[in-house]
Structures are given as structure tokens and as C-alpha cells.
């Protein structure tokens, strides 16, 4: 797996608001959500930089004045990370790292890193690694010599092959290997789902925005005890279990990964084995944290992703959660 963030690095986080049409659909507290994501990655927030941007520049995403502001903060704090609450292109990320002399992450890279720390099952770890490698393959413009060492180094290169070509080939080989293993896991899940249908069991899949409280609700059923925590993406693996309530014995409950706005496409594609459990559900139980002042936006984001995943034809029942805190 790709090297993750070091222990509690100091970071400068950057919020650049875009001038967009339809701002009424924007999150009310996206900055707070992003700060929570940064903390969840193990980062200490040393400073925040705010700004607005009409059209991102091709070389740095932000304008020269903002670049200098961040550079000064990085130097003052000896920051190890600069994290953008935006999507950066590979060239923008590379150029900023040269200017700041430190590592730069965008929103996608941050979420991938959090997933890497949360994955516990074999399948979950493979899915995260596939997403990371897919993301990394678009950013292979620097030397990644650690990839060579992972496979032994000497004898890997073809005649005249550059380090960059070697790394691309190694990543391509690893991606191919992971996909084969995930396909095998996917086929096994298909067998399991067929067995459930044959046994005339109905499946209720819990869906919702990350940290909405799906897993604590799942744990209300005596036989369904899973790890739950008040932090983003505490649950990554899809788990389906029966319950011991007499009147509901034919119903199976499935807990799944939480959604988030601007979920990286690499994760959606890589988590096919997990998300397919939703496609075969008889009912989607949409868990909503109504104590969150931003819950209306998050409901829209979940419904949008449900539509994008092709799940709109499955009946949906909304469950308002955390009403005692509202």
C-alpha cells in the first residue's frame, strides 16, 4: 500500500470558494467538514487560508498573491502539508510542491488517505489500494523509487527504460493484480447474495452521509455489533447480518460505507464489491442526522449519489437520526 501521512504533521489548509451558479445548493459548513477530514487524517491544523476564485490558474490553481501567503505560513509553521479543499490537477499539485517545498494534497488525496487508515478487511484494503494507485497513476511525473524496492529492484527494467516508465509499469501490474483479486471477491459476494435470495430473505441496506449514525443504528439489533465512532468513514466494509427480532427474522440488515460530497470517482469504481450490496437490496434505509444544521444539503448529496449509482428504482425509507440532539 502507498505510504500514508506521517504521525500528526502540521498542515496549512486552504479553502478556495468558487464563483458558481446555483450557490443555494452549496453546503453550509463545508469548511467545518473539511477541517474534520483533516483532523481524521491525523493532521494538526496550524493555519487556515481563505479566498475566492473565479477561474483557477493552470499552473498553481490560485493566484500569485495567495501562493505567497501560503508559502509564508508554511515557512513560519514548518508545515509538512498543505491541504486544499479543492481538486488539483497533477501539474498544479507538482508546481505548488516546488514552491512550498512541502507535500501538497487536494481533497481527493485526503479522502483516499483517510480510507487507507480505516480499511480493516482484506477486501477493504485492496479496494483502497486500487483507488490510491489509480489516483497515483495520473500523477506519475516524479520519481517513485520506493515502488521499485517493493519488487526487488535489480532486473526489473527493460533496456533503456526510465525510472518513470518503470514506476508506471509496476503500478499497472499491481492494478491488474488487485482487479483480479477483487473480481474473485465480487463473484463470491454474488454467490452469497444469490443464497440470500434463494432463502427468501429480504435485505435492508443502510445508506447515508458519513457520520450520520448508520452503524450505531445497525448495532441496535442484538446480533449486529460493529465498530462505531463519531468520525468520518468509521465503516468502510459492507456487512450483512441477520437479526434476532422474532417478527423480522426474514430480514437481513446491511451496513455500508458512508457517502460524502464530491466523493472521488476512484473510490466509487474501486468499491464495486461493496457498493454492489446496495444494488441487490430490497429497501434502502436512508439514515439522516437531523441534528446537523447542514442535513438538507447532505440529504441532497446522498440522493444524488444514489441516482448516479443507478439505485433510484429501489424503495427508499428515510430514518431521522439523532433527534435528541437536534
Ranges and model annotations:
Residues 10-19, 143-283:
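Conserved G1/Walker A P-loop phosphate-binding module
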Residues 1-113:
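N-terminal accessory targeting/assembly segments
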Residues 72, 128, 135-138, 142, ...:
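Alpha-helical coiled-coil heptad-repeat segments used for dimerization/assembly
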Amino acid at each position: 500500500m502507498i505510504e500514508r501521512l506521517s504521525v500528526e504533521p502540521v498542515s496549512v489548509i486552504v479553502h478556495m470558494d468558487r464563483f458558481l451558479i446555483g450557490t443555494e445548493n452549496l453546503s453550509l459548513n463545508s469548511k467545518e467538514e473539511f477541517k474534520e477530514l483533516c483532523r481524521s487524517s491525523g493532521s494538526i491544523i496550524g493555519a487556515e487560508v481563505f479566498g475566492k476564485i473565479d477561474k483557477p490558474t493552470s499552473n498553481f490553481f490560485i493566484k500569485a498573491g495567495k501562493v505567497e501567503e501560503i508559502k509564508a505560513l508554511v515557512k513560519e509553521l514548518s508545515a509538512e502539508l498543505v491541504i486544499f479543499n479543492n481538486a488539483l490537477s497533477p501539474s498544479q499539485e507538482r508546481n505548488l510542491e516546488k514552491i512550498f517545498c512541502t507535500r501538497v494534497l487536494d481533497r481527493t488525496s485526503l479522502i483516499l488517505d483517510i480510507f487507507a487508515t480505516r480499511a480493516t478487511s482484506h477486501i477493504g484494503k485492496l479496494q483502497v489500494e486500487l483507488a490510491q494507485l489509480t489516483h497515483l497513476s495520473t500523477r506519475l511525473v516524479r520519481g517513485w523509487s520506493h515502488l521499485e524496492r517493493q519488487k526487488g529492484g535489480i532486473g526489473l527494467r527493460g533496456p533503456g527504460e526510465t525510472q518513470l516508465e518503470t514506476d508506471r509499469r509496476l503500478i499497472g501490474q499491481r492494478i491488474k493484480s488487485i482487479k483480479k483479486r477483487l473480481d474473485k471477491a465480487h463473484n463470491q459476494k454474488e454467490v452469497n447474495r444469490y443464497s440470500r435470495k434463494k432463502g427468501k430473505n429480504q435485505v435492508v441496506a443502510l445508506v447515508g452521509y458519513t457520520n450520520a449514525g448508520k452503524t450505531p443504528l445497525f448495532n441496535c439489533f442484538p446480533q449486529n455489533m460493529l465498530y462505531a465512532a463519531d468520525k468520518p468513514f468509521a465503516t468502510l466494509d459492507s456487512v450483512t447480518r441477520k437479526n434476532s427480532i422474532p417478527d423480522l427474522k426474514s430480514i437481513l440488515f446491511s451496513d455500508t460505507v458512508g457517502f460524502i460530497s464530491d466523493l472521488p470517482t476512484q473510490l466509487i469504481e474501486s468499491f464495486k464489491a461493496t457498493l454492489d450490496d446496495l444494488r441487490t437490496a430490497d429497501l434502502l434505509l436512508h439514515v439522516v442526522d437531523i441534528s446537523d444544521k447542514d442535513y438538507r444539503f447532505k440529504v441532497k448529496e446522498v440522493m444524488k449519489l444514489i441516482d448516479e449509482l443507478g439505485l433510484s428504482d429501489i424503495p427508499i425509507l428515510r430514518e431521522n437520526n439523532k433527534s435528541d440532539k437536534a
